[in-house]
Amino acid sequence: MKFFQEKISIKETNILLKVDNPKFFKIAKNTIINERFNLENYILRNPIFLTSYSPVEVLDNAPKIVKLMAEAGFNADVGPMAAVAGTFSQLIVENLIENDCKNAISENGGDICLKCEMDTTVGLYAGNSSLSGSLGFKLKKEKIKNGYGICTSSGTVGHSVSLGNADSVTVFSKSASIADAAATSIGNFAVGNNVDAINKCLEKAENIPKIDGVFVCMGEHAGKIGKIPQFIKTDKKEGLGNVFEMF
């Protein structure tokens, strides 16, 4: 099966999208434009939604993107913007599914939502860690056929806010929105020496519902909790923004 890839950048939203038919790129672009409009307008009326590091109650008539982000924030005890990237990826894939797309991967700064009818390997990018680019997660088609989230937070890579120093905290969940906020929340506990920091992250992860599993990487050390996909050894030294490969 042939796949098509395109980078879509609209303001701060930068999506790397892989689909089985190029007609879906236009649908994805329209989804981003519409959801950005909804989010920006809500923030204009409710600026605390943009700046809060704590969960925020939202209005009953708030748009879907706002409600998803708020729910994810409460689930992980962080501000709603901690879920923004994963929520965009999730809404894109959900909209593509509604338009009969069979295979789609949306990656937004390390926050991935995918729906595939084949086994798919997602590579790990963890900055300067020795594990970066040498490890992947093999997701079975049964797990991802209806949509799935794999989101990564880092205190050493990228511009997103993290209060910890983990090279990567990767969270697996049916919801990319939930996974994104959880990754941020868990990553905030990555303080101290590597072993202690990883243990703190895993302890925090135990108390966050709606996630399947977590993998934490700091330097030469790593830890996991819950159910995560099978590890796959890779030889691809990929950079952020090109972290997945389909088989």
From Swiss-Prot:
Gene3D superfamilies: ApbE-like domains. Belongs to the UPF0280 family. This is UPF0280 protein MmarC7_0482.
